[in-house]
């Protein structure tokens, strides 16, 4: 049982690390570039109605 929980913990940490590297795990809708600058770090542009930080 300890091995099972260890594997779950490793998977959770890895998934959080991937989300951190790639930005948010969900799409952020926007109308202008200013919307993205408030919602995402690094002031990404708004492309096709979604922020480029995703």
UniProtKB/Swiss-Prot annotation:
Similarity annotation: Belongs to the short scorpion toxin superfamily. Potassium channel inhibitor family. Alpha-KTx 14 subfamily.
Domain of life per record: Eukaryota
Organism for this UniProt entry: Olivierus martensii
Keyword terms of this UniProt record: Calcium-activated potassium channel impairing toxin, Disulfide bond, Ion channel impairing toxin, Neurotoxin, Potassium channel impairing toxin, Secreted, Signal, Toxin
Other remarks on this protein: Negative results: has no effect on sodium, calcium, Kv nor BK currents. Does not affect apamin binding.
Expression (tissue specificity): Expressed by the venom gland.
Any GO molecular function: potassium channel regulator activity
Keyword set includes Transmembrane: no
Any one of the GO CC terms: extracellular region
Protein role: Selectively and reversibly inhibits small conductance calcium-activated potassium channels (KCNN, SK).
Record-linked InterPro entries: Scorpion_toxin-like_sf
UniProt-recorded name of the protein: Potassium channel toxin alpha-KTx 14.4
Record remark on domains: Has the structural arrangement of an alpha-helix connected to antiparallel beta-sheets by disulfide bonds (CS-alpha/beta).
Intrachain disulfide bonds: 30-46, 36-51, 40-53
Location(s), subcellular: Secreted
Region forming the signal peptide: 1-23
């Amino acid at each position: 049982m300890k091995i099972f929980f260890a594997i779950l913990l490793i998977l959770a940490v890895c998934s959080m690390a991937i989300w951190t590297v790639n930005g948010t795990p969900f799409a952020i809708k926007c109308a202008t570039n200013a919307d993205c600058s408030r919602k995402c770090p690094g002031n990404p542009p708004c492309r096709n109605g979604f922020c480029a930080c995703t």
